[in-house]
């Protein structure tokens, strides 16, 4: 076997944590997580183009403030010089913005790949390598035979519970819990109004 022979409770707990993480990602949203990762990258990065962009943006703001403070008719030469400087800064900012957007795109791809590796890959690995592992047993006679048979699907003897049923149960519980927690914060839906017929 390629993977180590894990204790059933280790598999139970690992799959539970992965499914909770997957539900958290679904509830929060990948785009929100990617935006958070990008903001963290902006804070900790020593990337020169980001620093240059911020300084040029501040410089453009100052130039525009000075330009608004003077009259174009009274001080035409100074206003024209400031206007040219603002146009030059805007062009530089646009170029830097394109570079930063490319960096953001690569950071988004990397964070998306990390989310995929952390939430989907472990589930597929477990499904392939631990599908025949008995996670726990149910006392005989608690459920009818057909329920025991369903719980043992797809590869286990009656009375055993495997990974497929465990994942189904955990997904159901976690998604229902997530709904109960997020429901009070959901956008309120207005009460429908009946169309009245005009005679």
Swiss-Prot record:
Q: List residues in topological domain: Lumenal.
A: 1-11, 137-160
Record's Gene Ontology CC terms?
Answer: endoplasmic reticulum membrane; GET complex; Golgi membrane
Q: Which domain of life is it from?
A: Eukaryota
Q: How does it sit in the membrane?
A: Multi-pass membrane protein
The family note in this entry says:
Belongs to the WRB/GET1 family.
Protein task = Required for the post-translational delivery of tail-anchored (TA) proteins to the endoplasmic reticulum. Together with GET2, acts as a membrane receptor for soluble GET3, which recognizes and selectively binds the transmembrane domain of TA proteins in the cytosol. The GET complex cooperates with the HDEL receptor ERD2 to mediate the ATP-dependent retrieval of resident ER proteins that contain a C-terminal H-D-E-L retention signal from the Golgi to the ER.
What this protein is called in its record is Golgi to ER traffic protein 1
The species is: Candida albicans (strain SC5314 / ATCC MYA-2876) (Yeast)
